[in-house]
Amino acid sequence: MKSLSFLNHEFEAFPSPELALTDPNGLLAIGGDLRPERLLSAYYNGIFPWFNSDDPILWWSPDPRAVFIPGEIHISTSLRKYLKKQPWRITINHAFTDVMAGCAQPREKQSGTWITQEIQMAYRELHHTGHAHSIEVWEGERLIGGLYGLAIGQVFCGESMFHRKTNASKAAVAALQQHLLKMGFKLIDAQVMNPHLESLGAKAIKRIDFITLLSELRNNPLDPATWTTKEVILELE
């Protein structure tokens, strides 16, 4: 039976994602807080927060789930040619706070953002504890694009991306895929399907299948150097 849970500020286990509502799709719980242990518990169980600034905290686990398989993200021939011509520099974990701020800027035709100051503070704390990570794209000293997300074992949970120059966010995606492949990641959680994700090769899978994959991969160990600050050289051949 589908049901909506209400969380208080006491830390408690999340309900099973299978209890999430079908309308709105995936809404599982309301309330609680964004302390690191609660956020990590959420992602560990296939749940993520998403809410507007005037809403309570809303927790989601939609069905179906949008995912990428590292190595199967579509980087078109024209995009490869374009990126080869750019003098851009790409880094990992050089400017997490600035990437989040870039992602928080309202999109065209949008008046607000779900990446509130509360969200930014919570994920900065996860970054400081080694759980949240960023990819940055630079033109000279100017940050022109990037993305951020969480690593849960061999699963990367993508949260948001932004660009200030055409295709800069796609460069970040290409760099992320290349890095995850080298480091043995098996899955990228993209949460909710949309036309842009679909154009990049995202697949919609049943929630139960996503949770099964997550449970198989979330405890797998990684190279300790996986998320050290570094530069990425795109391999676009």
UniProtKB/Swiss-Prot annotation:
Its lineage reads: Bacteria, Pseudomonadati, Pseudomonadota, Gammaproteobacteria, Alteromonadales
Give the primary localization class.
cytoplasm
Write down the EC number: 2.3.2.6
UniProt enzyme class: transferase
Q: Does the keyword Ligase apply?
A: no
Q: What is this protein called?
A: Leucyl/phenylalanyl-tRNA--protein transferase
Q: What is stated as this protein's family in its record?
A: Belongs to the L/F-transferase family.
Gene (UniProt): aat
Stored Gene3D superfamilies: Leucyl/phenylalanyl-tRNA-protein transferase, C-terminal domain, Leucyl/phenylalanyl-tRNA-protein transferase, N-terminal domain
One Pfam entry for this protein is Leu_Phe_trans
Name the reaction it catalyses. N-terminal L-lysyl-[protein] + L-leucyl-tRNA(Leu) = N-terminal L-leucyl-L-lysyl-[protein] + tRNA(Leu) + H(+); N-terminal L-arginyl-[protein] + L-leucyl-tRNA(Leu) = N-terminal L-leucyl-L-arginyl-[protein] + tRNA(Leu) + H(+); L-phenylalanyl-tRNA(Phe) + an N-terminal L-alpha-aminoacyl-[protein] = an N-terminal L-phenylalanyl-L-alpha-aminoacyl-[protein] + tRNA(Phe)
| Biological function | Functions in the N-end rule pathway of protein degradation where it conjugates Leu, Phe and, less efficiently, Met from aminoacyl-tRNAs to the N-termini of proteins containing an N-terminal arginine or lysine.
Which HAMAP family is this protein grouped with?
Answer: Leu_Phe_trans
